[in-house]
From Swiss-Prot:
Family: Belongs to the glycosyl hydrolase 15 family.
Active site, renumbered: D199, E202
Gene3D superfamilies (UniProt xref): 1.50.10.10, Immunoglobulins (2.60.40.10)
One of the record's GO cellular component terms: extracellular region
Propeptide segment residues: 19-24
Subcellular location: Secreted
Record-listed substrate binding positions: W143
Signal peptide as annotated in the record: 1-18
GO molecular function: glucan 1,4-alpha-glucosidase activity; starch binding
Descriptive protein name: Glucoamylase ARB_02327-1
Induction: Expression is up-regulated in presence of human keratinocytes.
Span of domain CBM20: 504-610
Length: 610
């Protein structure tokens, strides 16, 4: 994703992620009961409290802790917004520990909006600046700028929180603190949606399907949230239909052409990302908005994933209709053009989204456009509408589910034993490549696992925004910009009602497995010591020893299971002992809060010795 760009695979339950189950899973859907640590790995990359981001400004999301070969130690508007949308959905569903992170993010974005950059100032195009330094100063070197998807995605993330505030009777906070930041982004989108910008991979300066589709969603949500706040957004109202109209131009008849130029086919996982990030659980299989279950989106899924079948060595021998490793686009040459974890998870997520929609509307319609997709995974399929009461409905769902699970298994197969996600994995042997601990990757894993368990975000209003206007014209509209100054957040913004009540009392104890990747010598042992009594209160003589019984040549992993009180925050470090010598790992201290989530009986914290 950056002239470059911006996964692992373990299991996380909906409660641990914190989303709300809005559609009851089938009886054979097994929900996981252990927080696998992915959410914590994501939070570790957010300043100021994240263990990988302790030297960043509060609320800033770093793309990766990597500072060289390549350097991703910056904050990107797009990536940050996608990560915060994931966090905000989790918070809205009951994970209240995430609220401070959301507040710090919104405050940081209010400050960043005011920076003068090479893209401009607040009202002169500056919101299209793609990335910033972690001290909230501009990045003034050459880059692919402007990028117009960031403001749209940020507006969507902030609107999700504003919606929660309204639902919990905090109207004044939504209107006075969140709305001014959102309003600036909406003004940028309405003014610039019809202008050329760099795509999400920061390589092609052309119209982009991903950018247009997320801009359309943001404008629609802008209309709705403005009304809820007794505000108006006439520039949203005039431009949303036109953006939808333009969105249709990316459809070729068989697939989405994601962008133009540089001799590409236009097949790009960005189109699948566009569908999943505009998925509406209340929507139907609408072609105009490329909903995940639409004929267009399914045909495109086949076209995009098929484009990687023959070009990656690790996909060799995999039959048509079976899941494969997925990259960005087949002509990719960055790091030699490899599969990406987030791309492979996106291919799975669209299928889970589609199954949710089919179950919700109670039917599956197979058309000439979508037939090739269905035929690959269920050769007996016939065109027509298959009602949920029919055997064919169940057969198709089973086939799609198996296909989706296949993509999860592909990503798992090439994930290291630590579960820590890099950006890419080798097209030849599956070895993780490029930067480690990619924040967007962790977010993509959390969302695909949520969808896998029929856990979905709130509707964005697609049902009332899918009709193409009778007259389509290239246009733009200027909206107001204003300085959004956030000096403080009111205390005690607690939920007035839990959206998904816990059927039992919240746990007071949680068994936490600390997993450490550390290369050691014979006779050397590793210990855990920290600020709470259970970890020795920083006394090395009371440090907790780690086990090495799963340490192997290809996985230098130590671990220990410790029962800890829930909701307790503490600091800790790992130490090595050999004879009478004690070696501490480098500063700073690590930080962790023991999860206290409905239904979660265990958690995993993943670390690497430093």
């Amino acid at each position: 994703m950056r002239v470059t760009s911006l996964l692992w695979s373990s299991l996380v339950i909906p409660a641990a992620v914190g989303f709300q189950v809005r559609f009851k899973p089938s009886e054979d859907t097994a929900l996981d009961t252990v927080d696998d640590g992915t959410l914590q790995s994501l939070l570790d990359n957010i300043g100021l409290n994240g263990s990988n981001a302790w030297d960043t400004r509060p609320g800033l999301v770093i793309a990766s802790p990597s500072k060289k070969d390549p350097n991703y130690f910056f904050t990107w508007t797009r990536d940050s917004a996608l990560v915060l949308k994931c966090i905000t959905d989790a918070f809205a569903a009951g994970n209240t520990a995430l609220q401070e992170t959301i507040h710090e993010y919104i405050s940081s974005q209010a400050r960043i909006q005011l920076l003068n950059t090479r893209s401009g100032g607040l009202s002169s195009g500056g919101l299209g600046e793609p990335k910033y330094r972690v001290d909230e100063t501009p990045y003034n070197e050459d880059w692919g700028r402007p990028q117009a998807d960031g403001p749209a995605l940020r507006a969507t993330a902030l609107i999700a929180y504003a919606r929660w505030l309204l639902e919990n009777d905090y109207y004044d906070v939504a209107k006075s603190i969140v709305w001014p930041v959102v309003k600036n982004d909406l003004s940028y989108v309405s003014e610039h949606w019809n202008t050329t910008a760099f795509d999400l991979w920061e390589e092609v300066n052309s119209p982009s399907f991903f950018t247009t589709i997320v801009q359309h969603r943001a404008l629609v949500e802008g209309i709705n949230i403005a009304r809820a706040l007794d505000e108006t957004c006439p520039h949203c109202e005039s431009q949303a239909p036109q953006a939808l109209c333009y969105l249709q131009s990316y459809w070729t008849g068989t697939a989405v052409r994601s962008n133009y130029g540089q001799g590409r086919s236009g097949l790009d996982v960005a189109s699948i990302l566009g569908s999943i990030h505009t998925f509406d659980p209340e929507g139907e299989c609408d072609d105009t908005t490329f909903q995940p279950c639409s004929a267009r989106a399914l045909a495109n899924h086949k076209a995009v994933t098929d484009s990687f079948r023959s070009i990656y060595k690790i996909n060799g021998g995999i039959k048509q209709g079976e899941a494969v490793a997925v990259g960005r686009y087949p002509e990719d040459v960055y790091f030699n053009g490899n599969p990406w974890y987030l791309a492979t998870y996106a291919a799975a997520e669209q299928l889970y989204d589609a199954m949710y929609q089919w179950n919700k509307i109670g039917k599956i319609t197979v058309t000439d456009v979508s037939m090739p997709f269905f035929k690959d995974i269920y050769p007996e399929v016939q065109t027509g509408t298959h009602e949920s009461s029919s055997p064919e409905f169940g057969n198709i769902i089973a086939a799609v589910k198996a296909y989706a699970e296949g993509y999860i298994e592909v990503a798992k197969k090439y994930t290291p034993c630590t579960g820590m996600l890099s950006e890419q994995f080798s097209r030849d042997n599956g070895t993780p490549l490029s930067v480690a601990d990619l924040t967007w990757s962790y977010a993509s894993y959390l969302t695909v696992m949520a969808r896998r368990n029929s856990v979905v975000p709130a509707s964005w209003g697609e049902k009332n925004a899918r009709d193409i206007p009778s007259t389509c014209v290239p246009s733009s509209a200027t909206g107001p910009y204003q300085t959004a100054t956030i000096t403080h957040w009111p205390p005690n913004l607690t939920p007035t009602a839990q959206p998904s009540p816990c059927p039992t009392a919240l746990p007071t104890k949680n068994n936490v497995r600390f997993r450490l990747l550390a290369t050691t010598q014979v006779g050397e042992d590793v210990f855990l010591v920290g600020s709470i009594p259970e970890l020795g209160s920083w006394d090395v003589k009371k440090a907790v020893p780690l086990n090495a019984d799963i340490y192997a040549d290809n996985c230098h992993q130590w671990y220990v299971d410790i029962e800890l009180p829930t909701a307790v925050a503490f600091e800790y470090k790992f130490i090595r002992k050999r004879g009478g010598e004690v070696v501490w790992e480098q500063d700073p201290n690590r930080k962790y809060t023991v999860p206290q989530t409905c239904g979660v009986s265990g958690a995993i914290k993943r670390d690497t010795w430093r």
